[in-house]
Amino acid sequence: ERWLHRMRWANVMGKDRPQLVISPLNATVGNGVRLTAFEIPADPTKDRWAPTILNGEMNRMHNHWHLDVDGDAVIDTLTASREGVHLIRRTTAGWGKTKLGSGITADDPNQSGAGEIKTGRLKGGGMFITTVEPMHGHSLVVYTAPDKKGALWNRHVVDEGFRRGHALWTADMDGDGSDEIVFGHSDTPEVPGVNIYNGLDESGEKWEKHVIDAGGMATEDLVVADLTGDGRPDIVAGGRATHNVKLYVNTK
């Protein structure tokens, strides 16, 4: 895949060990990118990694994420692409695709859809999906489950006005039992950086913004983990244009 962009380990096929799942950015064969799972062979250095195409219908798939969405003990895949937000899961008939959200819409198809994607838990325990829209986009968005089965998820714009939003994570940063959104942007004039958004309600409609870095981090990517051993999640971000890596220590 000449346009291979993201890869993650996940047992999407229900085997005895995980597969390497890759999402290309642009299609090289057919009308869509090939979201593919590669099985680890007996000898990973010599044997062929058998591929299984999970979906080949979407374009500009900038990221994907894995979790058991429906609680059936099978790992599913969420995708962010030009066509929006989709759930890919294994069924008795093969691989199914369910549209959860359209993402942002624009006259230019390449300015539509979603680019980054993660999931988290709201106050009260409800699941949310968070995205950056469109790819390399200007809007931070949250999706919450609809009341009616089969309907598109409810879309809430959390914040907007950025340039090249490119990093996204969720974690319980303040120990209150619900997840915050950690978001990084790289090209916003004078103030590229890192923000944290704290959910204020169970509906996912109200969020409180906390600026962690304004101007010192042109965020290409970030991860959240406890790096100081105190039980609190910290943030590590890397900046392409600022040529730096920073550790933001959580003191909450």
PLM-predicted stretches and their roles:
Residues E1-K252:
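Beta-propeller-forming repeat regions
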